[in-house]
């Protein structure tokens, strides 16, 4: 590694954060500067860094600056022209990165000759989040002259000028499913050359895009494609940043686990119906209905709940019937069904078989929503090893950052969950929050709360009294969090007529 270039890159960090950004309204934060130096070293030395960055550090500016300086000072080599990937958990952060952070830094860096041209970024996401122009044309024709909700009609027609489904409000779930890009595009589609989704893919593959932004699920899906030697979803990249990294295990649980809901079963039967296999769809629907009946709680729940899966005699019989029919259908319909529908039949069979056999590689449970509707869920016990194989063995530098990576002053738990325990390239960095908690926070424990039965009206009244006093003390600047919907509703009813400040209840 060229020592002079490395020193120049670190010198630019000092100039950027001590001079250029303050000239544009940002304060100098020593923790942010130290964090950016550590992140740049991680990228230059091909390491993996766990960066615990407290509230108010400005970690997004830190890692974006480190990535841009990597591109500036080390543009050559096999990875020189490759982009970086920034993976987040929330759409809000993705929007902020592409709409605020990158344009702001790009302008300042251009004005001060740090970069020769603007930094270009693009959000990458699944095809089901985009409009299929052919399917949209069919749907618009189908609703012509029909009595349709006006807001939904406007949302549907707005897709003629906006192909990003996430950017349109008021669109019904049914319309969304009818117009989204299908799992497999027909090669004979007459709109293929003018398709907006394919134009998006073409632009995304351009060498001009330096920052690819995606969510954790998309990142893991790309990694799965690479492991299976399928075409990657993302362009080959030279560095990886995982923001909101504490959410990565949740995404991995979804990716490496399996789940089946009533909606999944309904969709599978609908696919068979569309292929004109009406009787097969009816028989399968009956088997699925019996299985759901064996799982249902049959009651409204205060909040979503999960319970361990127990293979009762009724559930065993229902699962056996479903599996038997799925196997028969795969055998009989193999010459006639599209391959992707056959694949759906196969993956449904495999998922149900986990519960029928009690597969010990998975934690099996039932997830109930608030209506009591069940979903069968299987969480992999091998998730850390799967993450390690997917992300950490590819010899690409990576930065994992969040405000909650440490627990009890240690990264031990995070290393375990992320599959990083045996990684030799791993480094830790802690950037303490500049927020003075000792001076600005008070832990208040009321000493006069009487003992009340849990869930009682008396409990709600006592809590309401304390909350009203605290709201008065803070002049309305209060957020009250509950672990129970029913208790929240009861307290809300107690306080709503007593406050002079605006009150909002969020479910």
Where are these regions (language model features)?
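Conserved helicase motor "Helicase C" RecA-like lobe of SF1/SF2 P-loop NTPases
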Residues: 479-507
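A contiguous, basic/glycine-rich beta-loop/short-helix subdomain that forms a polymer-engagement track
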Residues: 185-210, 223-231, 328-447, 458-459, ...
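Conserved RecA-like ASCE P-loop NTPase motor core of nucleic-acid helicases/translocases
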Residues: 82-92, 399-403, 476-483
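Conserved interdomain hinge at the start of the Helicase C-terminal
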Residues: 389, 448-483
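N-terminal pre-P-loop "Q-motif" helix
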Residues: 26-43
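Signature of the SF2 helicase/ATPase Hel1-core->accessory helical subdomain module
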Residues: 63-65, 69, 92-95, 99-103, ...
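A substrate-engagement module of RecA-like helicase motors
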Residues: 2-22, 27-30, 74-212, 216-217, ...
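Walker A/P-loop
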Residues: 45-65
């Amino acid at each position: 590694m060229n020592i002079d270039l490395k020193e120049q890159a670190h010198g630019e960090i000092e100039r950027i954060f001590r001079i250029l950004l303050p000239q544009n309204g940002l304060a100098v934060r020593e923790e942010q500067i130290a964090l950016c130096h550590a992140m740049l070293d991680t990228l230059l030395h091909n390491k993996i860094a766990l960066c615990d960055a407290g509230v108010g550090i400005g970690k997004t500016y830190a890692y974006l600056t480190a990535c841009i300086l990597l591109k500036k000072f080390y543009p050559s080599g096999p990875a020189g022209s490759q982009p970086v990937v920034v993976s987040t958990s929330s759409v809000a952060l993705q929007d902020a990165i592409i709409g605020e952070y990158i344009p702001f830094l790009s302008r300042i860096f251009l004005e001060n000759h740090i970069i020769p041209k603007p930094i270009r970024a693009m959000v990458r996401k699944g095809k089901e989040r985009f409009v299929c122009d052919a399917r949209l044309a069919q749907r618009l024709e189908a609703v012509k002259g029909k009595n349709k909700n006006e807001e939904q009609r406007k949302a549907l027609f707005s897709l003629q000028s906006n192909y990003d489904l996430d950017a349109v409000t008021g669109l019904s779930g049914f319309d969304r499913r009818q117009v989204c890009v299908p799992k497999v595009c027909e090669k004979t589609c007459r709109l293929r050359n003018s398709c907006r989704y394919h134009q998006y893919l073409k632009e995304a593959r351009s060498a001009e895009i330096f920052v690819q932004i995606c969510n954790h699920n998309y990142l893991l899906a790309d990694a799965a494609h690479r492991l299976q030697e399928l075409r990657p979803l993302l362009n080959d990249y030279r560095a990886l940043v995982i923001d909101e990294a504490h959410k990565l295990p949740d995404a991995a649980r979804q990716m490496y686990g399996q789940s089946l809901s009533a909606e999944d079963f309904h969709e599978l039967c609908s696919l068979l119906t569309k292929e004109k296999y009406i009787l097969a769809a009816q028989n399968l629907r009956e088997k699925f209905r019996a299985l759901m009946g064996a799982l249902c709680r049959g009651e409204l729940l205060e909040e979503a709940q999960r319970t361990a899966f127990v293979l009762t005699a009724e559930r065993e019989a229902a699962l056996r019937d479903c599996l038997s029919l799925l196997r028969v259908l795969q055998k009989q319909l193999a010459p006639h069904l599209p391959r992707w529908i056959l694949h759906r039949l196969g993956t449904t069979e495999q998922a149900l078989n986990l519960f029928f056999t009690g597969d010990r590689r998975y934690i099996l449970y039932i997830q109930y929503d608030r209506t009591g509707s069940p979903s069968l869920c299987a969480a992999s016990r091998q998730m850390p090893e799967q993450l390690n194989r997917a992300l950490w063995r590819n010899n690409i530098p990576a930065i994992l950052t969040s405000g909650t990576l440490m627990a009890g002053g240690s990264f031990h738990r995070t290393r375990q969950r992320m599959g990083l325990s045996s990684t030799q390239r791993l480094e830790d960095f802690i950037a303490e929050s500049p927020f003075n908690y000792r001076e600005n926070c008070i832990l208040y424990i009321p000493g006069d709360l009487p003992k009340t039965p849990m869930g009682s009206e008396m409990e709600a009244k006592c809590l309401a009294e304390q909350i009203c006093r605290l709201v008065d003390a803070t002049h309305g600047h209060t957020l009250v969090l509950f672990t129970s919907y029913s208790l929240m509703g009861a307290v809300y009813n107690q306080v709503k007529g007593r406050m002079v400040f605006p009150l909002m209840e969020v479910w």
